[in-house]
Amino acid sequence: MALVQLAQVSKVYRSLKGSDYVAVRDFSLDIEAGEFFCLLGTSGCGKTTVLNMVAGFETVSAGDIRVGGKPIAGPAADRGVVFQGDDSLYGWLSALGNVEFGLRMRGVARAEREQKARHYIELVGLKGQDHKHPSELSGGMKQRIQIARVLANEPQMLLMDEPFAALDAHTRADMQRELKRICAATAKTVLFITHDIDEAIILADRIGVMHAGPASKLKGIVAVDLAEAERERTHDRFVAVYRQVHEMIRDEVAIALQRTH
């Protein structure tokens, strides 16, 4: 059985004037335990809406979402969310304080939570930086602290909404490598949202391409059966997967552009 199951999921928003906006319609997807799944699509296609429903931040209008066979009833510790920016870090807390925050809220003893927090700070490559505050950290370091904070709560899966979008190209490439290393070390299931085809191929086991919104659903899935050495942009097999994904999303980009004019 898949760890995450979305069956015929729809999300409808109602405006103050009473009109309906269908963000997602009849969206179905299974994600296996330990899988890194990238959801790719144009701006406004409903990628974040899907993630928010899996996270439990938003309810479904129709359909069913299950994690570990159980219906989602709201946010829970089995699903950890890493956001795009660093606004979710508490500026008055050190890196250690940020990473252990969730454990402290759950009543974990100080010695245990500090030990666990330091373990995950080291795992994300920031050993010795635990005393620093967010204002003293670079953008990439802040994202690592976000990831460490989520991992410290030991969720079954990570939900990541374009977490590296605000980083410069060099830092973004570093964070992609670090994320792959961390996921290999922890065997976490990941749902990763992106609009970047290269990023999806570098990271994912499978890539799901969404139709352009509104009323979006999954258009198709591409398996990324590449060895690590083949995930370089210049490798022939990387280029072949890129073309396959690009062919699938090209028409959706055109549709999205038409709707903005």
Predicted regions span which residues?
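The feature captures the beta-strand-to-loop junction immediately N-terminal to the Walker
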Residues: 40-42
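Helix-to-loop junction immediately C-terminal to a conserved catalytic motif
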Residues: 55
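Conserved ABC transporter NBD signature motif
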Residues: 63-75
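Short coil-to-helix segment of the ABC ATPase nucleotide-binding domain corresponding to the Q-loop/switch region
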Residues: 93-101
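Conserved ABC ATPase "signature" region
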Residues: 100, 104, 111-129, 181
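Conserved ABC ATPase signature
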Residues: 133-137, 141
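A short, proline-enriched helix->beta-strand linker immediately N-terminal to the Walker B motif
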Residues: 152-156
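Catalytic Walker B motif of ABC-type/P-loop ATPase nucleotide-binding domains
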Residues: 158-161
